[in-house]
């Protein structure tokens, strides 16, 4: 193997895991040489109401992009995640809930989950929700979020979850785009000792133009905090559930019926509604969960992601429950009230598989041994990382400290658009290299291409693409198939472009090098630079703005904003604070710029295009390697920006 630090699979791990290296290689080869035969067999991981006869039907051709899997089969997601486990696992815990503070927790068995999901599905029906209708969720990390998701799938409604940290404007935009019929929320959320005004944000969102598609708001009383109540529109979760039966027949859904919409940031500013469908998504969620985490009966699994992100959808709810696992849902943050909180939760619930983000790992690493103080973490056997590439130093710390030098780390690479993990080690099959996502999952055909789209062989670096479809792939952008083709299939013809750069080493391992488009990855969450820029320029004192990503030791990427003020306006500490607060209000705390650089002008080409490449170099202090600047309309602007950057840093 090449020179990086290697962690080989131990004999014991290989012996006790679901797959060895030889089995992986054999199955992987089968999955790409005959995808229909491979997935035709693997699709049986689910229960089908009407078995499929067709497996794969996909095309990445320009103007004809179409993705279908198991298209003549019928199934129900909630039945696969709950009902089929009732006979053998009715009394097993399905959802373990841990509150923001250690004095709040709850255990929900599969039997209890079935009852709650059926009741809430009947509530949705009584509110006029039908198959294909969109339901918007803006929820805290409580079991009710999973109940609401599963209730939607039971009756064939399409859920659209908005992350609980997003602003009223962001909620409204997603409601309008999806024509949501109902909003499900809570009075307030709790996170890291703070209270999040969920209901108040929904109330404000529903004052915006175009949100009159919403007929009712169902409110779960989470904190008991006082909220505004709109008579005739707002309904109390507990009261409406009490009137409903705890039986609800699951709707038979076609494999290609929509399952959920999840909005993700694009480089053009308007969020994109990624659409996943029922059959292929759930097959892929179930398969990847089982093999990537080497899931075995009795495991207690904890994915720390919020359900507002794709990781929470696939690996907190659908993947684990489809496998009949026990999934821990956590309301808090890994370092509150003390840096040892994550390790304490592991010990309290005997967590055996832990899936978290490099941001959390780096934040804990900064606290050193405080992160593990008073804990033993002896229940852990598998660690996972998700959201962004993990730097080798953080990987080693995670392995040595949290995992006690005995738990393999699955460093998973995937996206909202991919539905599930595409590149990852498999615990008993893959020798590990800190910082590498290693090898593709079954059926996944990655390639590295140069800027012309030429496929590079062997050791190479360039743009990461996928050459063929896999069952969990998104099908389209909601109500915008043209934008879907334009965004993902126009850069490199006949290939799915991930937007990420990667290199492949001499062992065929993939190393993700980060975004190659105008999308930031802040704390593992994607945000379009254009989205933040449009929030900035909507401030009455700002004329122009350009946003770039800069390295950040905790968040991975920080947000560096160049801001040009209107004539007659001048920088001040007060305005600095006001502008940061403005962005928080417009988008959410996660989009708050780390640095504002007051700029008299921005570097532009003669055609008026802002040269972000140059702004990135200046922001990261690489002003001695700006590259070709011959197309600049006014080179003196660059000199001024470099001078200002040096003065402030």
Curated annotation (Swiss-Prot):
**Post-translational modifications reported in the UniProt record:** Acetylated. Deacetylation by the SIR2-homolog deacetylase activates the enzyme.
Where ATP binds, per the record, is at 387-389, 411-416, 500, 515, 526
- Record-annotated residues binding CoA? 191-194, 311, 335, 523, 584
Write down the EC number.
6.2.1.1
* Matches recorded under Pfam families: ACAS_N, AMP-binding, AMP-binding_C
Q: Which GO terms describe its biological process?
A: acetyl-CoA biosynthetic process from acetate
Q: Which cofactor does it need?
A: Mg(2+)
Alphabetized UniProt keyword annotations: Acetylation, ATP-binding, Ligase, Magnesium, Metal-binding, Nucleotide-binding
Family affiliation: Belongs to the ATP-dependent AMP-binding enzyme family.
As for what it does, the entry says: Catalyzes the conversion of acetate into acetyl-CoA (AcCoA), an essential intermediate at the junction of anabolic and catabolic pathways. AcsA undergoes a two-step reaction. In the first half reaction, AcsA combines acetate with ATP to form acetyl-adenylate (AcAMP) intermediate. In the second half reaction, it can then transfer the acetyl group from AcAMP to the sulfhydryl group of CoA, forming the product AcCoA.
| Entry protein name | Acetyl-coenzyme A synthetase
GN (gene name): acsA
